[in-house]
Amino acid sequence: MKKRTGRKVITVILVVIVCMFALFPFVWMISTSFKTAGEVYSKTPSFIPKAATMQGYKEMLTTHSTTFNFMQWLGNSVIVSLLTTAFSMIIATLGGYGISRFRFRGRGFLSYFILTTQVLPGSLLIIPLYVIMGNLQLLDTKIGLVAAYCTFSIPFCTWMMKGFFDTIPISLEEAARVDVAGRFRIFATVILPLTVPGLVATGIFSFINGWNEYLFASTFMKSYENWTLPIGIASFSGQYATNWGTLMAGAVLITLPVVIMFLLLQKHLVSGMTAGAVKQ
């Protein structure tokens, strides 16, 4: 009993240490966003703001110029993220269902090939995509950025949905065919309602990819009015000086939608991420 209690205590301590280590940057970000410029550059930094201020948030939300417009960048990020999520979910759902249910030559190779693409860094696609989008005149456009994001979100979402479809018994579809239901009707009315956790997981994955991505956006988007939030917030860091309070306020505003989405959908997200790993 003493050994078990000791192990539990050690486990709890280790978990607390890991959580503190992981959460510290976020807590420090929130704390800094409420500090004054003098307190940020103080020789003795404080964890809790001595004179909390909302000036950073006010500057971030109300500053409008030819080179800085938070609300416009927010709209661009929402549009790009939602379109990326919609296209990725539609294609990944149909592709995952096809690979899971249909038997064809090269099916196994295709499944592993899709998974292998996630091993390669996204930076390898920048030059080919830049050339292709330049030829198609899609550079500095939202639809071009959405297409770029889909290139690395669709493969993983397809693989994840395929694993989720594998857990749904084929007998359900066979029973529906007895009622003379077509394949598309079976897919829409029988299969899809059972894949809600998987759809939520792929949707959140695609949305976060589009919402947080910086490298592709900074490469393909050149006009200030077409920037997304990660590029816009990064531009707030000057060459000679940086207003860290305002910068951290922007970082908090970017993080909030993702945190809220996770808190609201965490039940479906966890079940969706794990269901495909167990074959029934």
Residue map of PLM features:
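A structural signal for multi-pass alpha-helical bundles of membrane permease subunits
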Residues: 2-280
